[in-house]
């Protein structure tokens, strides 16, 4: 397991453990944690691929900007359209974000930002910067 992939797996498990402790009534989060822990033993890259597909690809800009409205809207749509191991984490944005304490929101933003950075690193993606996200034309020969 690559260092970046290993760090990503450790961090996402810690995130889910924190969510289980914070929202013990949410059975889906506990089941998500168990699925991720099992996948880490068998195929850790699967966890990375799920996060990339269901969180990073469409929501990393919301996370980087701490855009509550964008992420809550995305999470609601994702949870309602396609349930998977990442859905249980997105569920907190759908069900609990509005009533959550600022300290919990801050902790979740920090986890999500770190997970996005580790995901990009493990996937070999360029860090997102304004110049990297803006299309440029290459000069014609």
Give the predicted meaning of each segment.
Residues 1-106, 120-134, 138-139:
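Terminal low-complexity "docking" segments
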Residues 110-121:
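Short, hydrophobic/amphipathic alpha-helical patches that form generic packing surfaces
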């Amino acid at each position: 397991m690559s260092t970046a992939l290993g760090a990503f797996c450790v961090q996402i498990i810690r995130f889910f453990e924190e969510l289980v402790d914070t929202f013990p009534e949410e059975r889906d989060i506990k089941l998500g944690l168990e699925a991720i822990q099992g996948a880490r033993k068998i195929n850790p890259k699967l966890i990375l691929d799920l996060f990339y597909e269901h969180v990073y690809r469409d929501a990393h800009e919301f996370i980087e900007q701490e855009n509550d409205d964008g992420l809550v809207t995305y999470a609601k749509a994702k949870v309602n359209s396609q349930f998977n191991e990442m859905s249980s984490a997105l569920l907190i944005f759908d069900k609990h974000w509005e009533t959550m304490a600022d300290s919990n929101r801050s902790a979740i933003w920090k986890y999500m930002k770190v997970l996005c950075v580790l995901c990009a690193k493990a996937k070999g993606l360029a860090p997102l910067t304004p110049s990297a996200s803006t299309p440029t034309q290459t000069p014609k020969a």
